[in-house]
Amino acid sequence: MAPVPDPNSVGGGAKRDEATTKIPSKDSKKKDDKKEEDLSEEDLQLKQNLELYVERVQDPNPELQKIALESMRKEIRDSTSSMTSVPKPLKFLRPHYGVLKEFHAKMAESDLKKMLADILSVLALTMSAEGERESLNYRLNGSESDIGSWGHEYVRNLAGEIAKEYTIRQGEESSIEDLMDLVQQIVSFHMKHNAETEAVDLLMDVEDLDLLLEHVDNTNFRRTCNYLTSAAKYLPGPDDMLVLDIAYMIYIKFAEYPNALQIALFLDNMQYVKQVFTSCTDLVKKKQFCYMIARHGMTFELDQEMVANDEDKEALQDIVNNSKLSEGYLTLARDIEVMEAKTPEDIYKAHLLDGRASSGPSVDSARQNLSATFVNAFVNAGFGQDKLMTVPSDSTSGSAGNWLFKNKEHGKTSAVASLGMIQLWDVETGLGHLDKYFHSNDNPVVAGALLGVGIVNCGIKNDCDPAFALLSGYIDNEDSSVRIGAIMGLGIAYAGSQNDQIKIRLSPILNDANAPLDVIAFAALSLGMIYVGSCNEEVAQSIIFALMDRSEAELGEALTRFLPLGLGLLYLGKQESVEATAEVSKTFNEKIRKYCDMTLLSCAYAGTGNVLKVQDLLAQCGEHLVKGDIHQGPAVIGLAMVAMSEELGLDMEIRSLERVLQYGEQNIRRAVPLALGLLCISNPKVTVMDTLSRLSHDTDSEVAMAAIISLGLIGAGTNNARIAGMLRNLSSYYYKDASLLFCVRIAQGFVHMGKGLLTLNPFHSERLLLSPTALAGIVTLLHACLDMKSIILGKYHYVLYFLVLAMQPRMMLTVDQSLKPISVPVRVGQAVDVVGQAGRPKTITGFQTHSTPVLLAAGERAELATEKYIPLSPILEGFVILKENPDYREE
């Protein structure tokens, strides 16, 4: 027997409800009554009031109309001050929206019509059809009353409609004055209510960022500028530069000079840099500016305008010239207690491996000794002492002389040059150590001494120009290895300096029909480095003619790739400026034409994150290979160069490269590890580490070599234990293959670079600024790695020393106003992006407290853990001057 359904049971009730909802009542009045019964007394009262107001608004008596409109306005205003859900008045007025619109259209021009337009503008917020922009139209016809009284949501909606209307009017070329008056009001409202980001967005949409300058004040200019600088990364040119210009002006307006200087450096605008110096009157602050310029690797001459007093000017110029770098670096090394020299064996840790590899050939092979030379140079870089080259000559075993002669011909060049690396940044001592090798009759030794002079002077400027004085005499030597030593030395010592004396000496070599190809290639590369990012026409012409003069056979040589690279470096990061040269490159011999095109494109857009260029380069990678084409290598490296500027693009690029690996042809697979190495340089991301580890066992030895070198690059200067372990295992895996073992050793040298105190990352100042010289050094090495066998495993292994351009201490060293190091507690943790967030959120997470000097890993940020001092730099990296806080009270 079927159970009798209980009319009060839940199920039955639910069914009944369903039935009532499904069948619409014929009598709509009953339905309305039912709805009204659901309302609370207050809501019912409000609904009835609003309906009454709607009727009164249509009353012929203007007095009644006015009272009704004012009452309606009050109800709506009270409810829209905060919008968590659609306010009740807007709900209840929904059915009457059409009626009010019709009545508004019929009304004669009067203040009452404007009042009604204001109310309709707010109602349109929830009621107008998509894309009609009714809210804005009624606002423009309404009164001039305060826009903010209707609440944030209304203002935000209006801003969105203005942006669309602006675009349409620009297309029609009609007047936008009425819109701009409204924009003024909205921006003013946003800036007063901590919504700086929305104000900036609106002004970007209506292309009038200059308005910001009127509306920023002391409380919100920092947040505004932070947003401007981070938004600039995602804007197409030339908008990005305009946005940064505004940020610069705001910083100058509020005397926030260190931040202004950073933007001036980013824009590469020398006038702005000078303006920062002339606007600021505080000498100690100027010292901090000098440290910032020195870290950027910029050649900069101070003049009377910037610093009036000669003595002060000299002291400041010393800082710009980086003459304090070695001292600071060694202070850090002593503090962390890593001064003791390390031998290559300390790095290889062969005792940790099982017997096979460690009991390998015990005879000294030239290649093993060469790799030990490099490992020794990179690991002890800048420490001024090691156990192979700087040992006093009286100790018999392993003295410098002995070690030098364990290397064969061109190996001696790298061995002597390694002295420059060990004495890095300490010019006087370094030149003293190298001096004796100039008197040698052995050309490779002299070449090494010349290169060593260049390395020791890297990034250090000196009034008496010792590098030029020593090297210029050897530029036209008969022996090509000596010439290359001098030319490379000049390129490294004067990178980024745009030194005309050197141009006068090196340019003739490019067009000398009798000069050997390798000398011409290195001359082009050195000129590219000295004039990096300068777009210098003369140098570009010289390199273009040199490329046109090459014979078919020479264009097939491995070193020829340095000519297009030298040309590309002239336009590093300069975007459209490269176009004329790129057109000329289309006339080159087809053997080098595409290679040149890819190199120019990737250099010009390096660090810009330009999505369209990434797509162009990916398209090149997708083409099928025609025999003899070598242009896809630089295209893959170009992908990394363009996309490395910000985190989002970088992660996207890593994923794209995974696809390129899967579907690309063999020559592309050889370049992918190098691109990954550049994207994560000195920043060992686990996913990339695993990919490279997989590729390091690839059946194609070129892919394996590139992956091994890249493992070294992503771990460069980090002492990363996991990468060190991988490389140790690879050294036992490849113990029979001299070439691959050489690559493993080089990578081990990179990982332990400067005993873990250095970084190769070309970005600094919290990834805002890109040092062009540093990137030039890294890219040169990567292009050389595209043909490992001919260049790095051939006789041009000293190309590895170009990396010195990117080597910088990853330290934060605090000094007092007289530039003496002081130790203060600082918190070091993962940096958090707080741009556009409300309030004052924490800028670091997961921090530890240390005493300065401290090391900063990739993605880390430091902040002072004491209020006793105020830092003069907004970004705590490198040398930071602290001044005592006058308001500080000891507890």
Swiss-Prot record:
The keyword Nucleotide-binding does not apply. PC repeats lie at residues 414-447, 448-484, 485-519, 522-556, 565-594, 674-705, 724-739. It comes from the Eukaryota. The keyword Ubl conjugation applies. GO terms for cellular component: plasma membrane; proteasome complex; proteasome regulatory particle, base subcomplex. Residues 1-43 are annotated as: Disordered. InterPro entries: 26S_Psome_Rpn1, ARM-like, ARM-type_fold, Proteasome/cyclosome_rpt, RPN1_C, RPN1_N. It holds the Pfam family PC_rep. One of its GO terms (biological process) is regulation of protein catabolic process. Residues 14-37 have a biased composition (Basic and acidic residues). Ubiquitinated. Expressed in stems, leaves, buds, flowers, siliques and developing seeds. Keywords: Proteasome, Repeat, Ubl conjugation. Disruption phenotype: Normal phenotype. GO terms for molecular function: enzyme regulator activity. Belongs to the proteasome subunit S2 family. Component of the 19S regulatory particle (RP/PA700) base subcomplex of the 26S proteasome. The 26S proteasome is composed of a core protease (CP), known as the 20S proteasome, capped at one or both ends by the 19S regulatory particle (RP/PA700). The RP/PA700 complex is composed of at least 17 different subunits in two subcomplexes, the base and the lid, which form the portions proximal and distal to the 20S proteolytic core, respectively. Acts as a regulatory subunit of the 26 proteasome which is involved in the ATP-dependent degradation of ubiquitinated proteins. PANTHER family: 26S PROTEASOME NON-ATPASE REGULATORY SUBUNIT (PTHR10943), 26S PROTEASOME NON-ATPASE REGULATORY SUBUNIT 2 HOMOLOG B (PTHR10943:SF24). This is 26S proteasome non-ATPase regulatory subunit 2 homolog B. It comes from Arabidopsis thaliana.
